[in-house]
């Protein structure tokens, strides 16, 4: 194989990898306790600022990843969510999203 062939093979392989690591829902389950403290309580509202906390069970996996990354980067503003999101690695965010997306939506 020539250097060019090796390089092109490597570049092609990288181009086809996912932007996010595949999430492991079992690992996500062990991390989700921190989410259910707010997102698992019916009619829960934050003390400050005061607004309804949404239920997230069954939410789209890609949306959860996007939202948590946005909180971590400060693109979405909420002190609690920003701190929570920053505490997770990219893999842990993917794991959480994989787990939460498989849960039944709250009624």
Model-identified regions with their sequence ranges:
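Gly/Gly-Pro-rich "capping" loops immediately C-terminal to redox-active cysteine motifs
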Residues: 29, 40-72, 82
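The canonical Cys-X-X-Cys-His
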Residues: 33-41, 96
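N-terminal alpha-helical segment
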Residues: 6, 47-49, 77
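C-terminal capping alpha-helices of c-type cytochrome domains
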Residues: 73-76, 84-107
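Classic N-terminal secretory signal peptides
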Residues: 2-22
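Electrostatic cytochrome c docking/interface patches
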Residues: 16-32, 44, 52, 104-107
């Amino acid at each position: 194989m020539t250097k060019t062939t090796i390089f092109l093979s490597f570049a092609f392989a990288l181009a086809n990898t996912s932007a996010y690591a595949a999430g492991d829902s079992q690992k996500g389950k062990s991390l989700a306790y921190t989410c259910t403290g707010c997102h698992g309580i019916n009619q829960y509202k934050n003390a400050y600022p005061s607004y309804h906390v949404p239920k997230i069970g069954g939410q789209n996996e890609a949306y959860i990843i996007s939202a948590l990354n946005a909180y971590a980067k400060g693109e979405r503003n909420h002190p609690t969510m920003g701190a929570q999101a920053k505490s997770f690695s990219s893999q842990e965010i993917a794991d959480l999203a994989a787990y939460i997306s498989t849960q039944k939506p709250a009624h």
